Amino acid sequence: MKSFIARALLVLVLASFSQFARGRIGADIPWTTYEAEEMTTTGIVLGPKYGPFLVETESSGQKCVKLRAPGEYVEFTVQSSANAMVVRYSLPDAATGGGIDSALAVYQNGKLLKELSLTSRYTWLYGKYPFSNKPQEGKPRNFYDECRLKDLSLLKGDVIRLEKNDARAPYCIIDLIDLEQATPALAAPANSLSLAEFGANGRGEMDDTEALRKCIAAASKQGKAVWIPAGVYKLTGDIDLPARASIRGAGMWHSTFVGAPELYGQADRRVRFKLNGSNIRLEDFAIVGGLNYRNDLEANDGILGNRCDNSVLSRLWIEHTKVGMWFYYSSGLMIEGCRFRNTVADGLNFCAGVRSSLVQNSTTRGTGDDCFAIWPAPPDQAFATLMPGSNVVRHCTGQLPFLANGGAIYGGADNRIEDCLFTDISPGAGILLSTTFPTSSEQLKVDNNFSGTTVVRNCELRHCGGFDHGWEWRAAMQFCLDRKSIS
């Protein structure tokens, strides 16, 4: 225990004081956030409130604005030019669960710009972990969703109004609005095969699963990349990626893979990219699933990697899947510039057998479990010799999960969380070092408990620490010796 205490103090000193000497903390954020409670409004400002099962607590800064009657609005002045918008909002659930639909009108300088379609289909979970969609079980969480709007032309000084113009929902709550100057759509890279050549049209109306599979097979055979032109592409099954496969899109705002809502209840019909070999590259596209419940017996959708050494995943936007990314038995991974939004579980998890891997300059918001996790779970027998460790979470920003923590390390050797920003972590700790989850196997004589030196350095925690469903109250930064000592 003495060893644990000494090391814990070292970590806390580094976290508390080194930020003043080491420069930037968190990810590079290309958007400007406008908080609803700071806007001009005819609605009601809610909060701050601090406690479980409250929409205010799940809000940025624990404040938000509630629009009730048609005609009520929030309004703000644009600080810098932008062509893309994200609105974080909350609608009520249907009386029996399943969500409702509504709309908001967006005005620019008094002129109707766009009507946003909103839904609560992917929010509202209830009861005990892993939660349900049944309102009668009480204890609600996961109040918020987001919608994206692009191809705008907003100038500094423009006045933007979001107005409730729809009576289908008794209210609409606005938490925040992000404005961003999204980069133009990228051109096709040299030495690539276009998905369009295999029958996909980019309108999101047809099933593009087989077209993508054929394009990947042909590109791999020819040693070329797969090119995803700007557009929307529907996927209804697994996309298996062999070694050295490369998929490149026109940008996370431009090339989007979506799931089929009517099929998303079937675990094998979801949007799932499976990395099954080394040196794979995924770049510049978005994945938008359709998951609205958690079942840990079902395979994760999003991106899964197994034995995918030295793979690079850059500038991906992943939303409405169970996890953003989950990796096993891999080394030398590089994840950079990614956004994980509104997942049902983790944003990113370096799980069993992951070593010498890095996630950097990436962000999460609205995840249903840890924003960024390092969990060296017990290995399968075939991988018992792979020792996890030396993984790094660096220059990342985690915000507003509805369960669990910002950055979490559950064991392993010499793992690090550095230069990170965690804000509004109301259901858990900003940073958690814990032995709660299993990391050892007596049968395989493997023990992946904490070893070497675990480092948390130059991190900033804002509005962190709160009610955890299993542990009641968490600290802003917590050491949890649940099943084993840390020594």
Language-model segments: residues:
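Bacterial N-terminal signal peptides that target proteins for export
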Residues: 1-9
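Extracellular beta-strand-rich solenoid/capping regions of secreted or surface-exposed proteins
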Residues: 213-218, 233-248, 255-284, 288-310, ...
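Bacterial N-terminal signal peptides
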Residues: 8-16
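Extracytoplasmic
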Residues: 24-189, 457
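Structural detector of coil-to-beta-strand junctions
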Residues: 225, 270-272, 293-294, 300-302, ...
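Extracellular beta-strand-rich, repetitive "passenger/adhesive" scaffolds
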Residues: 71, 165, 201-203, 223-232, ...
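Acidic Gly/Asp/Thr-rich repetitive segments characteristic of extracellular carbohydrate-active
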Residues: 195-229, 240
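Right-handed parallel beta-helix
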Residues: 250-253, 278-289, 309-322, 331-345, ...
